[in-house]
């Protein structure tokens, strides 16, 4: 290999999210607010007089019992033995089990002392009644599934690991904590096989960077509408057609038909909200049920831009005019839009814009939108597309009363996903509120609602350290806002909670498909 390319394989592995290190996973687990870990990297002689040292990755307390945790990646070579012998992980867990039983009394006393010290210092500690503290004699193995794509080989590997671990379940406990995208893909494909999609078949065509290919998680073109909750299937397609909205990931390049992708966040958003878009009371209950809303809302207003009267939620909403220098708004394509939109008045009679951004299994690698090139000959390295974006949005950010201003926006957080979307949507809502000429949806205020499953750790718990000092997506974004209460992150199940009793059939469908 030529010397100048020698670092390529190493960098590919370094920046490949499937190759995230065990230490990085461990650090992310510790930094999360829940569960709280009492200790990490605990090391101790196996027993008095022994030279052998044993080490646990994490220690926590559950139900007044000390739990010792070993962490492994799904791809770790120690999880399986290539020639069929007992894998190293089994021997390792057996050693942990014997160590805990041998030293249980000493471990309880040690951790009582550590607990009191951390409590005195005001450090995070798990809930516990120290007088009742005992020890769980079975160590717990946490396996992090870092796979981003599902293959038959990977499924076989996971099944073999589970089979071997189950044979030793009397000695230790284990859990595979997955990559949310991978887990949801498995759930959706299982539902597809179980006729949840009314007999729809996978194997549809997806047109992506690698051209046109068939995938088992893409519905066949004739089954595409079965990607929707049954009562909305015909109406949602008509809505997009009548309002001139292009579909994301459409079965055809012209955006005229819905996506057959069963993990589409656009489809997920519509399945959650489209059914209630004309139910004024349901929409009001929905937004007043969101914890942390900066106002209490009195009335939901119909959205004038819709093709039919009486719509209280709009989808792929754009502004009535070009506020962001984007060469004209087109719903669903090539401009800033919001996945869903609600228009309301508060108890004081003042109008609010409520743009909703919807995420499902998305996660993002580092990609600087301010340094992107145009495609074509002679464009590489000129950052033409990035410079266009900088010229389009930088002045708007500098005049914003919500976004923190920076001395230079090249490579900044505002031009990295998912923040690039959030930045543009914030400017979108702010510019409409500030405009004296806005006649379609004039408003005095806005609140930005970001819907994302709380289990999507690759998106929410990622440390965007290249562009932020804060850990996690929510903290990183709120650090860039002057009024943090105008941004609300919520799980879709929590969003729909006010409708559990009034829309049982809808919520049962959503629970079966999305909330497991």
Predicted region positions:
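Charged, terminal alpha-helix-loop-beta segments
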Residues: 1-516
């Amino acid at each position: 290999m030529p010397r100048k390319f020698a670092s390529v394989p190493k960098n590919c592995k370094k920046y490949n999210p499937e190759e995230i290190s065990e230490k990085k996973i461990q650090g992310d687990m510790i930094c999360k607010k829940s569960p709280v870990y009492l200790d990490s990297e605990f090391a101790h002689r196996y027993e008095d007089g022994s030279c052998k040292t044993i080490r646990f990755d994490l220690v926590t307390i559950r139900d007044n019992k000390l739990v010792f945790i070993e962490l492994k990646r799904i791809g770790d070579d120690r999880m399986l033995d290539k020639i069929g012998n007992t894998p190293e992980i089994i021997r390792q867990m057996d050693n942990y089990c014997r160590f805990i039983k041998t030293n249980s009394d000493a471990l309880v006393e040690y951790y009582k002392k550590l607990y009191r010290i951390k409590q005195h210092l005001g450090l995070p500690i798990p809930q516990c009644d120290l007088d009742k503290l005992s020890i769980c004699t079975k160590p717990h193995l946490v396996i992090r599934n870092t796979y981003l794509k599902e293959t038959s080989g990977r499924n076989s590997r996971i099944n073999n690991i589970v089979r071997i671990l189950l044979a030793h379940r009397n000695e230790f406990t284990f859990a595979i904590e997955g990559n949310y995208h991978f887990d949801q893909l498995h759930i959706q494909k299982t539902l597809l096989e179980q006729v949840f999609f009314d007999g729809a078949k996978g194997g549809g065509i997806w047109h992506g960077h690698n051209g046109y290919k068939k995938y088992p998680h893409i519905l066949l073109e004739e089954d595409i509408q079965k990607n929707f909750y049954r009562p909305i299937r015909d109406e949602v397609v008509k809505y997009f057609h009548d309002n001139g909205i292009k579909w994301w990931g459409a079965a055809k390049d012209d955006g005229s038909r819905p996506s057959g992708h069963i993990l589409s966040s656009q489809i997920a958003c519509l399945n959650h909200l489209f059914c209630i878009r004309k139910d004024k009371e349901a929409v009001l209950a929905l937004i007043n049920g969101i914890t942390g809303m900066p106002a209490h809302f009195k009335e939901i207003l119909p959205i004038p831009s819709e093709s039919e009267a009486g719509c209280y939620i709009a989808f792929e909403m754009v502004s009535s005019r070009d506020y962001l220098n984007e060469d004209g708004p087109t719903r669903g394509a090539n401009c800033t839009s919001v996945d869903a939109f609600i228009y309301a008045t508060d108890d004081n009679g003042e109008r609010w814009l409520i743009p909703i951004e919807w995420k499902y299994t998305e996660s993002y690698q580092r990609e600087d939108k301010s340094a992107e090139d145009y495609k074509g000959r002679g464009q590489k390295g000129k950052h033409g597309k990035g410079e266009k974006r900088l010229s389009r949005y930088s002045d708007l950010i500098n005049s914003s009363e919500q976004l923190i201003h920076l001395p230079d926006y090249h490579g900044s957080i505002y031009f990295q996903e998912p923040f690039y979307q959030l930045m543009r949507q914030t400017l979108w809502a702010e510019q409409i509120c500030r405009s004296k000429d806005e006649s379609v949806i004039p408003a005095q205020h806005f609140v930005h609602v970001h819907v994302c499953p709380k289990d999507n750790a690759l998106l929410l718990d990622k440390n965007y350290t290249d562009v932020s000092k804060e850990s996690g997506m929510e903290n990183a974004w709120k650090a860039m806002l002057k009024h943090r209460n105008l941004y609300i992150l919520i799980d879709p199940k929590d969003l729909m909670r006010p409708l559990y009793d009034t829309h049982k059939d809808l919520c049962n469908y959503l629970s079966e498909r999305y909330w497991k």
